[in-house]
Regions:
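Conserved long alpha-helical elements within nucleotide-processing catalytic cores of c-di-GMP signaling
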Residues: 45-84, 91-121, 127-131, 135-139, ...
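Per-ARNT-Sim (PAS) sensory domains and their PAS-associated C-terminal
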Residues: 1-19, 23-25
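Short catalytic/binding micro-motifs of nucleotide second-messenger systems
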Residues: 17, 63, 118-123, 155-167
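PAS-family sensory domains
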Residues: 23-34
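Cyclic nucleotide signaling catalytic output domains
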Residues: 126, 152, 156, 166, ...
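PAS-associated C-terminal cap
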Residues: 32-39, 49
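Output-coupling edge of small sensory domains
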Residues: 15-18, 32, 159, 177
């Protein structure tokens, strides 16, 4: 793409099309300058960070809220703008750092990032929020499918990690909130996902869906 200053730049494009009668009628998305990638991506895992995740979630909320609805307040189209937010917190991460050292903990985070990426589609977004917390944004997905995908992610993260000469067992507690909840803001979705994750962790549920 050409920058406003007239120079050629490489960009990353992420977008979501809206369909009417099977025909794409509009698209919303974002372009990011890859030269500025460093400030928006996590250096350890090479995943998007909190700002990019929040920006994409805000776009999906706007699309979902603007979708045509029927008399019951349910999206009239076939879930094209539905989405789900997952918050994942690794189990026993502090113990891994304390026992094996931070270098092993860092490699564990890198392996978790790659497993998460392998569990989602190209339209989805995986981000590292802070420490051992990750968010996943699943696009164009209904609540039942989102719950199934969260269970698949939980199973993938529970498998042993081989890091050097060590075999590490971790896994994750996952909170899930679907756009079917019709929450109004980014912070509302993140708080709901956090509450569900906390319940999953304290009650050893693996995955907990916000109700």
């Amino acid at each position: 793409a050409f920058h406003g200053a007239g120079r050629l730049v490489w960009v990353n494009w992420r977008g979501l099309a809206e369909f009417e009668d099977g025909v794409a009628v509009r698209m919303a998305g974002s372009l990011s300058d890859l030269a500025e990638r460093g400030s928006s991506y996590d250096a350890l895992t090479n995943l998007p960070g909190r700002p990019l995740f929040r920006d994409r979630l805000a776009q999906l909320i706007t699309l979902h809220q603007g979708d045509a609805v029927n008399g019951d307040g349910v999206p009239a189209r076939s879930g094209a703008t539905m989405f789900a937010v997952l918050l994942l917190d690794l189990n026993g991460f502090k113990a891994v750092n304390d026992y094996y050292g931070h270098h092993v903990g860092d490699q564990l985070l890198q392996q978790v990032a790659r497993r998460l990426e392998s569990c989602v589609r190209s339209v989805d977004l995986v981000a590292r929020m802070s420490g051992d917390e990750f968010n996943v944004l699943l696009e164009s997905i209904d609540p039942a499918e989102a719950s199934q995908r969260a269970q698949q992610i939980a199973a993938a993260l529970a498998a042993p990690y081989v890091i050097g000469e060590h075999t590490v067992i971790s896994g994750a507690s996952i909170g899930l909130v679907s756009s079917a909840s019709s929450l109004p803001t980014v912070d509302d979705y993140l708080r709901a996902a956090d509450a569900a994750m906390y319940r999953a962790k304290t009650q050893s549920l693996g995955v907990c869906v916000f109700q």
